[in-house]
Amino acid sequence: MARKKGREIHGWLIVDKPAGIGSTDVVGKVRWALDAKKAGHAGTLDPDATGVLAVALGEATKTVPILTDALKAYDFTVSWGAETSTDDASGGVVKTSDARPDEAAIRAALPEFTGEIMQVPPAVSAVRVDGARAYDLAREGEVVELAARPLWVESLELLGAARDSAELRMVCGKGGYVRSIARDLGRKLGCLGHVAQLRRIWSGPFEAGDGFAFDRIDRANQAEIEAALLPLQAALADLPEMQATEIGATRILNGNPGQVLGHAEFGEEVWVSRNGRALCIGRYMGGEVQPSRVFNLG
């Protein structure tokens, strides 16, 4: 598809991503369909994963870091008895085991994977190693030892167990790899494992029910897709909202500290609006907000 300059359009389209397509390809499809000048996404999904992919348009891209840092929830199936090169079903089998865990053993192991944990990303991942993506190095046959990174796991719940697989739900913070959880849980249980299926069911304030089916994008016209857009501020649900005074709004839109009504903790990150229009994200400084990202909505 040829590159187009695009038009100014702002907001979020929550796409229900199917398996077999990359997150950046989804963003490109949305941008093309809406003739949008600017687009991005908050939180990459593996090509084989499905579910909530939040696509930001225009000034909503300035709120992507907020959503990227938000908790996200995943439903996934772990297949026991084999570890793969990618830690999911797309990779080749590298180790096998005849052992199988019972439900009690699985439940007993889960607490070790909750709270603040250290996680080694999959060898085939977007993590950068000396400037190169780990998955590019893996394709070139280079063996890369990735360093463990901290991850907050809010909860890890067993939804169901069979002899050769288990269904789980994980709620975690930024940078979590479900594939690593499946791999490490399989090792802990002595049976090995990999992700067979993975679906993101919510991301911050956005849920699967908000999702616009990916295959509808080609069939729908621009007006139908625009009707599904959520406002820019939908991603800011976890931040306190402050109301700017008339003079404060003018100052904020010029990048200066502006007067607001209400109170928050000194230095707390907030977002500011005036007459229903989002103005900025910034820090509350006692009666004023110092903007860090101003929304130029025209």
Curated annotation (Swiss-Prot):
What Enzyme Commission number does this protein have?
5.4.99.25
Q: What keywords would UniProt list here?
A: Isomerase, tRNA processing
Q: Which GO terms describe its molecular function?
A: RNA binding; tRNA pseudouridine(55) synthase activity
Name the Pfam families on file. TruB_C_2 (PF16198), TruB_N (PF01509)
Task: Spell out the reaction equation it catalyses.
Answer: uridine(55) in tRNA = pseudouridine(55) in tRNA
Which SUPFAM superfamilies does the record cross-reference, listed alphabetically? Pseudouridine synthase
Q: Name one GO biological process term.
A: mRNA pseudouridine synthesis
Catalytic class of the enzyme: isomerase
**Quick check: keyword Heme in the entry?**
no
Note whether Transmembrane helix occurs among the keywords: no
Query: Which family does the entry's similarity section mention?
Result: Belongs to the pseudouridine synthase TruB family. Type 1 subfamily.
| Job description of the protein | Responsible for synthesis of pseudouridine from uracil-55 in the psi GC loop of transfer RNAs.
NCBIfam families per the UniProt record, alphabetical: TruB (TIGR00431)
Protein name according to UniProt: tRNA pseudouridine synthase B
